[in-house]
Structures are given as C-alpha cells and as structure tokens.
Amino acid sequence: KIKGKKVNGKQMRTSTIERITNETKVNLVLNLDGVGRGKIKTNIPFFDHMLEQLTFHSSVDLELNARGDIDIDFHHSVEDCGICLGKAFMEALGDKKGINRYGFFLLPMDDALIRVALDFSGRSFLSWKVNFPSTRVGNFDLELVREFFNAFSTNSGATLHVEMLDGFNSHHISEAIFKAMGKSIKMAVAINKDVEIIPSTKGLSLIHISEPTRL
C-alpha cells in the first residue's frame, strides 16, 4: 500500500530514511507529490547543486542532510545518498498502483544532449553510456555521478538507461543528466487517474513492501 499520511483527503506518497555507517550519516525525507522544493546539504557544493536540479525538475520535495568522511574523498557520501534516495523511492511508491511506471526525457543544455529512460519495474539495472571530457568539476570526481545513479537504481529497483549523445563541457553534461533524470522521474511516478491498477500484466496479488515490487 502507499505509505504516507493524508492531507486534505489525499494520500501523500512519502518516505523517511536514516542511514548511519562508520563513514556517513544520512537523513532523508521524500514527498513524491511535492512541488520541486529541495533542502539539501551534503557539504559537497557541486553535488548539492546537482541534487537540487533533480529535485526541481522531478517536482518531488526532498530534504537531505548528509555528513561523511569527505576529508578522505566524496565517494561514501555520494554513494550513500544514492542508496537512501533509492530506498525512499521504493518505499514511497509502495505497490506502484496507478503510476505511469515509465519515464523518459531527451534534454539539451548548451553543448550537452542527454537521453534518460527509466522504469520503476522492481528490476535493478543501469546502462551508462557517458564519457566526461574531464575527470573533475572543481574538486568533484565525475566518476561518482555513475556511482550515485548505480546506487539509486539498485535500491529503488529501477531499470535506468543514461546516454550522452553530445557534449564537451563536463559541467553541462553532468547537470543535463540530473535534469533529465528529474524529468523522467516526474513522468514515471505520476498517477494515471484513468488506470487504477498496478502497471503490469503479471497479475500481482501479493506485494511485500520490504522488497522492490517486480513488474
């Protein structure tokens, strides 16, 4: 069943996640039926900027506070944020009844052209066809962008394809990826009011919310 409280008679699709390890502490609150409002602090400015883009363009509301061993590097913090965001989507989507399930977007940003396709199927898979011209933007290691989306895919039970079609500016490429992901999420999690069923022909009758619902 959809998790969350009712507001004005409407069931809100929400999730609260806390993850504490020896390397990080992440607190996250997600509302799928938001307005694109983000309150994000990871102490990694470029990553914060990317998550703000994803939040705004997906129209979800996201509060995320992360503290990690960024004095060593950003890997643990970025990956754990992906883990928590993925788990939050899995929980907030519940049995996925009535959602579009699929989302896709082709997004241009100056020189960059990015295509993202997403399926909240319950089957985790990431296809990543991105070549950043540089290895870093400022002090942010760009290989962590893939790590973030891999963690998200694994923990949300999503099939995700990300493809770079053009681009020469690494900042633009990364930002276009997060924006296109946001647009794809917005499409996929939207409720189709004409179809009040689980979006699958498998005929699911028993759902365990602790695991991704495979469609």
PLM regions with names:
Residues K1-I2, K6:
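Polybasic, lysine-rich low-complexity intrinsically disordered segments
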Residues G9-L206:
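Structural preference for solvent-exposed beta-strand-turn elements
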Residues I207-L215:
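Conserved small/polar residues in nucleotide/adenosyl-binding loops
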